[in-house]
From Swiss-Prot:
GO terms for biological process: translation. Residues 1-22 are annotated as: Disordered. Binds 23S rRNA and is also seen to make contacts with the A and possibly P site tRNAs. The keyword Coiled coil does not apply. GO terms for cellular component: cytosolic large ribosomal subunit. It holds the Pfam family Ribosomal_L16. This is Large ribosomal subunit protein uL16. The gene is rplP. NCBIfam families: rplP_bact (TIGR01164). Part of the 50S ribosomal subunit.
Amino acid sequence: MLQPKRTKFRKQMKGRNRGLAQRGSKVSFGEFGLKAVARGRITARQIEAARRAMTRHVKRGGKIWIRVFPDKPITEKPLEVRQGKGKGNVEYWVAQIQPGKVLYEMEGVSEELAREAFALAAAKLPLNTTFVKRSVM
């Protein structure tokens, strides 16, 4: 699963996920893309589950790009532990997603097959997405 090899600090503050995606909002590698419509956060496991669903549907044909990376650590305290005594341990990593962010890209397959594959991937993700095509400038 995806996670940073090393970080400057082990734990991060919660922070806020405001605004729209300025960077990574256009399809730039493949022909088709899966774009987030809502804001939220995607765990490394969800990114991997969606990738597997797409890869299996296109039967390893074409090329897939993952455009998001989980770089934010999420901490949790163990069950039945009282509050206090410091921040919990890092349990998993998430990517914070703003509306307009392209999550996955694909090329080398037909549009119909890409739509089906992205529909399977979208079912694995906790936020609403839409299918987009590369726009020629």
